[in-house]
Structure formats: C-alpha cells, structure tokens
Amino acid sequence: MTTFSPREIVSELDRYIIGQHDAKRAVAIALRNRWRRQQLDPSLRDEVMPKNILMIGPTGVGKTEISRRLAKLAGAPFIKVEATKFTEVGYVGRDVEQIIRDLVEVGIGLVREKKRAEVQAKAHVSAEERVLDALVGTTASPATRENFRKKLRDGELDDKEIDIEVADAGSGMGGFEIPGMPGANIGVLNLSEMFGKAMGGRTKKVRTTVKASYSDLIRDESDKLIDNEVIQREAVRSTENDGIVFLDEIDKIAARDGGMGAGVSREGVQRDLLPLVEGTTVSTKYGPVKTDHILFIASGAFHVSKPSDLLPELQGRLPIRVELRPLNKDDFRRILTETEASLIRQYRALMETESLSLEFTDDAIDALADVAVHLNSSVENIGARRLQTVMERVLDDISYNAPDRGGTAVTIDAAYVREHVGDLAQNTDLSRFIL
C-alpha cells in the first residue's frame, strides 16, 4: 500500500489531470486514511470505517482518469467497474458480488508479484541451470558446464535458440457457470485449472532465444518457491483491509422519475449494492471476504438523473460528495500542453516515426481550445474528449500524407487550425464531424 502523503498524491495526479482540486483532495485523503488505519491499535482499527466518496460532474472532466491514475498509485487491490454491467440477482447477467471476486483476483496478482520479487535471486540461479541444461545437456562435464556458464554470463550466447519446458498456463478452455444454481459463479468452473491440478501441472515445450527464455524460466522457478496458501491468505487480508472499488457510471442505475420497466432492474442493482457497501461477507474460491473495510468511490455525470434519485440508503453510504466543475478554455489549453502525455506530445511522437517534425504555435493552441469550447457549448458538452475530435480533424491531411513528407517540418498556426476546423465550428448540424 502507498505511503504517499495527501499532498504527494495530489501532486502525482496533477501530472495527468488538470484542475478538479477538490476531487483530488478527497481521494488523496481517503487513500491516506487507509494507511492511517493500519497504524492503529487492532481494537480500534476494526471500528474505523472507510468514508466512501461520490464524485459528481459532467462527462469528460476527469472522473474516470482520476480512477485510472489512482489504481497505479494505490499499491493495493484496486478495481474499476461500470455499474451498468451488473444486473439484479435473479436476472441473467453478472451480480454485484462478482466485483469482490474480481478484486480478490487483483489482490492475488499483486501478492504473487511481490513474492516473486522476494525469491527472484534464487529463481535466477535455478533458471541459469536450466538454460545450461538446454545448451549442453545434463550429462556434460563440470568443466564444459563452467565454460558455457562464463559465455552465458558474458552475453555471448544471448541469440542462440534453445528448447525449454515451461508451465502451461492453460489452453484457453475458459470457465462456465452452472445455470439455475444460486451462487454458482462463486468459483466459475475453470476446466483448465481443474485438469492442471489433476495432472500435476502441465508443461509445454517452447523454442526461444537464451535471452528471451530467462523471463519465462524465472517466473516458473519463482512459482515453485512460493507457497500458494500464503499468497491466498495475504491476498484476502489485503483485499479486506486495503481494497478499493471504483464504481463508474453510477448515475445510469439511478431510477428516473416516471416510467417503470428497466427502472425496476436498475433499482435492484442499487439494492444489491447496499450490503456490499455497508459490509457483508462474499464467498470466493479463495474463501470468504468481508467488505466492511473496502473503500468505494462512486462517480457519475448525473445528466438525466440526480444524486437524490439514488436510493436514500445508498446515498447515506456515500457520505463524501465532491463536485467536479466543467472545463473552460484555459483548462483546455493546459490539457494540450501541461499534462504528462498531452495530446500534442502524442501527435508529435507519432509523426516523428515518419521523420516528420510537428510544431504548434501558441496561437494554434489557443485556436484549438477555442474551437473545443465553442463545440461543447453549441452541440453537446463532452468535456476534454472534444479535443480528440478537433485534433484529429486538424491533423487529418498531415497524418494521411506523412509517409510522403518524411524529413520535413510542419508548423501549425491559428490560421491552419481555423482553415481545417472552421466548418466544424460553424456548421454544427453536420453530424459526420460531431462525436
């Protein structure tokens, strides 16, 4: 789990997301509180419940991006799910308990990687022996073996091809659910897993270079040194205490005034979410998982519905409300220039692969921001996503002709932007240009 302070978390999010300081602060404090709780006395630790967050704001202002960046920062089991993908228990589809099962799988992956790192040195030694076996055979004399070991460590044999046996992760025989059995998807029957255990772990022969073989062999040897029981126990503990669930599009399951039908099922999903957010025990194939201390961050645009359309009990379980504001021209300008992987930087890098140098003047960036603001206000406000539409339109000709213009430099100014997107800004009825 991350030990970043709230200020450091906000500063890290600032590298990718412009503005929305309130939302960043809320998630930073929530993340830090996870760490603070771990430092408490065990008797008090169980009493400290996470303060779940509801993020409200128009589309394209950074709600989902905050969750993506938070996942990388968290250093804890983190899963982002769309609320619209789940159905009420009793209907065909995935029920909300699957969220926790998926979260445990994420936890298993995290703990396994950590354990692999701990035994990597031992695994590397074993992997080297297996490479030598493949190169000189198991019956070679110690002198020959040492001679090849020296060459191997000096990198002289990196490109030599060898045959190695590695664990077969499964042949794509997926799992299936047993119809008509309640809770059947606790451990969706995974055929490859069952057969693998029955046959004592299958292996497959792979032909690869010496250099490329190391990653597979080290992973293979690491897994032999790791106790799966310990991994499962630690993953369940980590999920229960540090797990974070990001529920996107929660406004889509809010019951709207008037009209029944689909609304009944939407309300059913909310009812199913209640015990999960409040604290319940979910059965998984790794054992029962308590959700009392899992942090839930919900977000929605609430264009059609309002937060008050959610069930009152669910509203009560999301005590921290954060509003994200719509983006203005200055925000668009900063998104184009200041973020770590800004659109302008991406397009420059793409064109450099064709040996084409792309430059944007300051007034071109202003013009791009102007067009995006105008389209958002006159057509539909889709936030920062509008910039992708505008940029694609501006660079359409350049992208198409780039292979023929290699070795040249192109400077884009305000006049060029207006020439290529002027019609887009004026004829808002031309639906082919509107995202």
Curated annotation (Swiss-Prot):
GO cellular component: HslUV protease complex
Subcellular localization(s) per the UniProt record: Cytoplasm
Keyword terms, alphabetized: ATP-binding, Chaperone, Cytoplasm, Nucleotide-binding, Stress response
Entries under CDD domains matching the protein: RecA-like_HslU
Binding annotation for ATP: 18, 60-65, 248, 313, 385
Any one GO biological process: protein unfolding
The keyword ATP-binding is annotated on this UniProt entry: yes
One GO MF term attached to the UniProt entry: ATP hydrolysis activity
SUPFAM superfamilies for this protein: P-loop containing nucleoside triphosphate hydrolases (SSF52540)
Domain of life (superkingdom): Bacteria
Protein function: ATPase subunit of a proteasome-like degradation complex; this subunit has chaperone activity. The binding of ATP and its subsequent hydrolysis by HslU are essential for unfolding of protein substrates subsequently hydrolyzed by HslV. HslU recognizes the N-terminal part of its protein substrates and unfolds these before they are guided to HslV for hydrolysis.
NCBIfam families the record matches: hslU, PRK05201.1
Similarity comment text for this entry: Belongs to the ClpX chaperone family. HslU subfamily.
Record note on quaternary structure: A double ring-shaped homohexamer of HslV is capped on each side by a ring-shaped HslU homohexamer. The assembly of the HslU/HslV complex is dependent on binding of ATP.
Protein name: ATP-dependent protease ATPase subunit HslU
Native organism taxonomy: Bacteria, Pseudomonadati, Pseudomonadota, Alphaproteobacteria, Hyphomicrobiales
